[in-house]
Amino acid sequence: MATIDVFDINKNKVGEMDLSDAVFNGDVREYLIHEAVKVQLANRRAGTVGVKNRAAVSGGGKKPFKQKGTGQARQGCIRAPHYVGGGVAFGPQAKTYALSMNKKARKAAVRSALSMLFKENKLSVLDCLSLPSISTKGFVGVLKTFDVTKTLVIIDEANTNLELSARNVKDVKVLKAEHLNVFDIVKFNNIILTQSAVRKIEGALQS
């Protein structure tokens, strides 16, 4: 079983903890990581073009005038394409870019990404990460203590002081453990986790 040092907020070693090999020290399957990132980015896309056809335009269900006896050409609906305000015939529609990935593969991709960073010594575990007040300066001080840049901070539950302190720091993201995803893991150079977040991640990814 893999082990990792546990530090306090001042980077003083306070102990060690065992890590699940299945989650943090497994095989790195790069094709799964690539697939998961591709799915995430595709699902963020939204089509920006789209017009209403005659089925989508409101109103016009009633026949505008009777079929015969008026001397005009017969009409069935005032929302036909040749009417002003009618639907567009064969107009452009928004494309759906959504892709899917089954749950088992998504979990395996997250495990692979975590294992990759663990093997590259880019994971740091803290016993806790609580700030006494909202302080960007205090949070930046923690990052400098650990000598990390472009960092993903993973916590187990909402931490208002930490989240507000970090929100204006460039290349830093605070994420709750249940929202952990492959794209964020590979986007950042380093990951800082709390002990409780590690256990929460292991519980979610081992099941």
UniProtKB/Swiss-Prot annotation:
Q: Which InterPro entries does this chain map to?
A: Ribosomal_uL4, Ribosomal_uL4-like, Ribosomal_uL4_dom_sf
The UniProt entry, under Gene3D superfamilies, shows: 3.40.1370.10
**Which of UniProt's keywords are assigned here?**
Ribonucleoprotein, Ribosomal protein, RNA-binding, rRNA-binding
- One example of a Gene Ontology biological process annotation: translation
Q: Report one GO cellular component.
A: ribonucleoprotein complex
Q: Name one GO molecular function term.
A: rRNA binding
Domain of life the protein comes from:
Bacteria
Q: Which NCBIfam families does the record associate with it?
A: rplD_bact
Q: Subunit notes for this chain? A: Part of the 50S ribosomal subunit.
Q: Please state which protein family the record places this protein in.
A: Belongs to the universal ribosomal protein uL4 family.
Q: What does this protein do?
A: One of the primary rRNA binding proteins, this protein initially binds near the 5'-end of the 23S rRNA. It is important during the early stages of 50S assembly. It makes multiple contacts with different domains of the 23S rRNA in the assembled 50S subunit and ribosome.
HAMAP family attached to this UniProt entry: Ribosomal_uL4_B
> What is the recorded name of this protein?
Large ribosomal subunit protein uL4
